[in-house]
Amino acid sequence: MTEEILELYQFEACPFCSKVRQKFTELGVDFIARSVDPNDRTRVENVSGQTGVPVLVDPNTDRVMPESDDIVEYLEENYG
């Protein structure tokens, strides 16, 4: 079975988002960066029920996860 690509809802300048992007790179895991407009967070709210970033969407496990530390731990446990 082919794995689907993970999605990361994020801001480029967000240090918490940067931490998650670095973990993706460290693990060699492909992902799609979905940049969120800081003035219109409707898209991330529709996905996660909240307006904060980063938010990980893993279509392989149907997980939607906020919080950078939780995302990093999840990536290490499931894709490391």
Identify the residue ranges that each predicted region occupies:
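GST-like domain detector, emphasizing the conserved glutathione-binding G-site
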Residues: 2-12, 18-80
